[in-house]
């Protein structure tokens, strides 16, 4: 065991492509060391923090391999260079999702958290304007299309890490329960790890949900005096994370995700979906026929 060890691999995303589920599955395996909180954002927006802070985000237990799953890393422009400053050639796993479906799932998440009041079409129209002012809030919560520029994001990593190994997967394949073991075996093989057949792989983390009480949602997802007081009363990030996670889970009411009707979307976004899909297939050799509308 080495508590001060940097990751051997990263699952870079993408956002809304089962990264929370992968984190929970791999966290069952004692051979893996993962951060207690799935997304540390250390190599993206928290790069000003110390390495000691980063090491403290991990559960220091006996392990064979250390990794991090953080979908902000595929999107944040400086992350490849930030990683390179500390790690020469880590392995990268990227799980992609049909671009327009990913955008819609992101939109529903922002809406459920009280961050979005527009219709889906209007939100897409407003995206560039929202992102132009450099707002961290919009960068996180209104980046529906810009997070789907997969080809550009992959090429950025390949340029910085020409000697690293990459594994590309599709979210849609993982949705099929019968495929899950096959995909996980592929991940384990890629990481030179022995797959464990006793892992629970049947759950689905971070499902679509409504918040039962909006005032609780706003307390846990917005900056306010009570959150500041909570932070002062409980200095430990880990304990705050545990408490907040439990409150959020109790406040969630899982629902079946509303399926996106492509006929209601402006045609230019359908064209955008197809263009991004074709571009990705060329750079990653993925079969994206099912993504074309």
Label each residue range with its predicted role:
Residues 1-293:
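Anion-recognition interface
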């Amino acid at each position: 065991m080495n508590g001060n060890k940097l990751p051997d691999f990263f699952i870079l995303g993408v956002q809304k492509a089962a990264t929370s589920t992968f984190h929970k599955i791999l966290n069952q395996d004692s051979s893996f060391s993962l951060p207690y909180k799935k997304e540390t954002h250390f190599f993206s927006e928290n790069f000003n923090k110390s390495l000691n802070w980063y090491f403290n985000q991990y559960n220091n237990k006996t392990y064979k391999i250390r990794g991090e799953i953080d979908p902000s890393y595929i999107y944040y422009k400086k992350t490849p260079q930030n990683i390179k400053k500390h790690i020469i050639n880590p392995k990268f796993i990227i799980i992609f999702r049909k671009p327009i479906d990913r955008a819609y799932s992101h939109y529903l998440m922002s809406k459920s958290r009280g961050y979005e009041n527009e219709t889906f079409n209007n939100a897409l129209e407003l995206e560039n304007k929202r992102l132009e002012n450099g707002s961290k809030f919009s960068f996180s919560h209104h980046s529906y299309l810009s997070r789907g520029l997969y080809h550009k994001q992959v090429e950025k990593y390949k340029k910085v890490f020409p000697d690293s190994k990459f594994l590309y997967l599709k979210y849609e394949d993982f949705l099929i329960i019968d495929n899950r073991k096959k995909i996980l075996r592929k991940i384990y093989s890629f990481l030179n790890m022995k797959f464990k057949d006793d892992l629970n792989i049947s759950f689905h983390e971070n499902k679509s949900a409504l918040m039962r009480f909006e005032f609780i949602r706003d307390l846990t997802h917005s900056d306010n005096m009570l959150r500041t007081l909570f932070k002062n009363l409980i200095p430990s990030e880990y304990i705050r994370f545990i408490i907040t996670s439990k409150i959020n889970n109790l406040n969630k009411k899982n629902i079946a995700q509303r399926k996106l009707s492509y006929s209601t979307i402006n045609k230019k976004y359908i064209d955008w979906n197809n263009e991004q899909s074709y571009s990705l297939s060329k750079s990653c050799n993925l079969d994206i026929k099912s993504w074309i509308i």
